[in-house]
Amino acid sequence: MTQQSPYSAAVAEQRHQEWLRFVALLQQAYAEDLHLPLLQLMLTPDEREALGTRVRIIEELLRGEMSQRELKNELGAGIATITRGSNSLKSAPVELRQWLEQTLLNDK
């Protein structure tokens, strides 16, 4: 087993703080109805498309009607991306999973 150096831990903490800063900025942008321009500024068209695909992956995994291979073919996403989504969903807090089910599956 390898140990993280203090530098690695410090870098990881800095990145975590930067992530939290972005989340706070996004919350403020939503409160001021500036979320779309902010996201267009911060994300490339490919990144925005990838996020949309990830939402579809989570939605279809929650629905449970397609295999991961069928989902790969339907969405044109890599099997590794779908597997990561599946693994993330399995480890998600119950409250988040319930909210996602209600939001993504019951709103259609």
Swiss-Prot record:
Alphabetical keyword list: Cytoplasm, DNA-binding, Repressor, Transcription, Transcription regulation
Subcellular compartments: Cytoplasm
Ranges annotated as DNA-binding: 68-91
Gene Ontology molecular function: any one: sequence-specific DNA binding
Taxonomic superkingdom: Bacteria
Annotated Pfam families: Trp_repressor
Family recorded in the similarity comment: Belongs to the TrpR family.
Function as written in the Swiss-Prot or TrEMBL entry: This protein is an aporepressor. When complexed with L-tryptophan it binds the operator region of the trp operon (5'-ACTAGT-'3') and prevents the initiation of transcription. The complex also regulates trp repressor biosynthesis by binding to its regulatory region.
Protein name from the UniProt record: Trp operon repressor
Organism: Klebsiella aerogenes
Gene that encodes it: trpR
